């Protein structure tokens, strides 16, 4: 998996940062895909600067209904329809996202020509496509807001083909059964247990993508042990009280969460427009002082998971 940041500003766009939108590129060898997390104003325009277009999207996850996370959605849906893309799309989000989509399309005389499914969610597991699971966590914000934890299923370990050949097992259908951990019976009556010839399973990658939030109990569960945590750092540590009053987090709080949750890496985003490049570097330094494995996202930054 890899993350492509389309927008990294908080509240309003700036000359260098658009509002929130993140692509998750699912780099599976046989079932690749592209998911979008939040869709602030101008998201479809930002996508023009990437290798992806709205027609490739399979799923969109909306954290909450504030405009800087949502107002790009109607235009993206309409453009996807105008392009004649027939592939289905599922939108996940809090209560009200269905009404928002229906109202904006109706009042603008617009429609979608592709199958559009809208899932209004609550906290808990919301998706398992056989390759990965998505769990939603309710966060602390003035509007109903969620963060999403995406965890790949573990991959089976490699089959020790050399040892199997030495045991008299020839490549073919039996190898497939053994790779699945099954027990097979050979022509001479011997039974071979696939588990005895498999390397340990490879743990799937994991990422936690937060919506806007002040510190809360659910945040630790959402982030616990993930490879990558994407979290807002709207304001610096000196403005922590103001950040929390508006349902946001400071640099210090975000980095502390990353440390307590034992994540692999922290990626900072959702930066207030008050900070220029020098100010952004100060935000980064505040986070790294607590959690060194921190990166600052810019528009079009790409990070592997």
Swiss-Prot record:
The active site is at 68 (proton acceptor). Its EC number is 3.1.-.-. Its cofactor is Zn(2+). Keywords: Endonuclease, Exonuclease, Hydrolase, Metal-binding, Nuclease, tRNA processing, Zinc. It comes from the Bacteria. Zn(2+) 2 binds at residues 68-69, 212, 270. Binds 2 Zn(2+) ions. Zn(2+) 1 binds at residues 64, 66, 141, 212. Transmembrane segments: none annotated. GO terms for molecular function: 3'-tRNA processing endoribonuclease activity; exonuclease activity; zinc ion binding. The keyword Hydrolase applies. Pfam families: Lactamase_B_2. Belongs to the RNase Z family. RNase BN subfamily. NCBIfam families: PRK00055.1-1, PRK00055.1-3, RNase_Z, true_RNase_BN. Homodimer. Zinc phosphodiesterase, which has both exoribonuclease and endoribonuclease activities. This is Ribonuclease BN. The gene is rbn.
């Amino acid at each position: 998996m890899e993350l492509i940041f389309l927008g990294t500003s908080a509240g309003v766009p700036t000359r260098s940062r658009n509002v929130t939108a993140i692509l998750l590129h699912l780099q599976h060898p046989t079932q690749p895909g592209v998911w979008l997390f939040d869709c602030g104003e101008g998201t479809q325009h930002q996508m023009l600067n990437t290798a992806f277009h709205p027609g490739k999207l399979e799923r969109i996850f909306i954290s909450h209904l504030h405009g800087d996370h949502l107002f790009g959605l109607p235009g993206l849906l309409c453009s996807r329809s105008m392009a004649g893309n027939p592939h289905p799309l599922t939108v996940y989000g809090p209560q009200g996202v269905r009404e928002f989509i229906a109202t904006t399309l109706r009042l603008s005389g617009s429609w979608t020509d592709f199958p559009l499914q809208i899932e209004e969610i609550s906290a808990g597991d919301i998706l398992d496509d056989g390759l990965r699971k998505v769990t939603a966590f309710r966060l602390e914000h003035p509007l109903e807001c969620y963060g999403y934890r995406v965890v790949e299923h573990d991959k089976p370990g490699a089959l020790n083909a050399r040892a199997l050949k030495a045991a008299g097992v020839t490549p073919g259908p039996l190898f497939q059964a053994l790779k699945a951990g099954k027990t097979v019976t050979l022509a001479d009556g011997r039974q071979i247990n696939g588990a005895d010839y498999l390397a340990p399973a490879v743990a799937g990658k994991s990422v936690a993508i937060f919506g806007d939030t002040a510190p809360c109990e659910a945040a630790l569960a959402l982030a616990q042990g993930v490879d990558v945590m994407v979290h807002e750092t709207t304001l610096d540590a000196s403005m922590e009280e103001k950040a929390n009053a508006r349902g946001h987090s400071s640099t210090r709080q975000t980095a502390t969460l990353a440390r307590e949750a034992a994540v692999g890496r922290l990626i900072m985003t959702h930066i207030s427009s008050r900070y220029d490049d020098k100010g952004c570097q100060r935000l980064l330094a505040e986070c790294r002082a607590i959690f060194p494995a921190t990166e600052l996202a810019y528009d079009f930054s790409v990070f592997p998971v």
